[in-house]
């Protein structure tokens, strides 16, 4: 098993733990090309976008994280970024140097509290 496959296995477990949280709808690890390599939707959750739109959203999330890293030298690294929408809260966490943990949560969540919980569960 490669080191990368080992990381994916670890993140599969972490995503499953995150999905046990009531407020989390989706937890997935995206590779640098925006491919979902582990995780997914909580059982019983209906995706709000079709597969093509989700793939586009995944690629855009990775690109946004990468773009923010251009400012790490001056401002320090981004721990997470979040956007509150009417239907969901989306959160991204840079992990494994060039991967992204993408979280979709219920729209009523306290973003900072949820982010701290995610970082605690994932230990980063």
Could you say what each language-model-derived stretch is?
Residues 1-124:
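Non-catalytic interaction/Regulatory regions outside core domains
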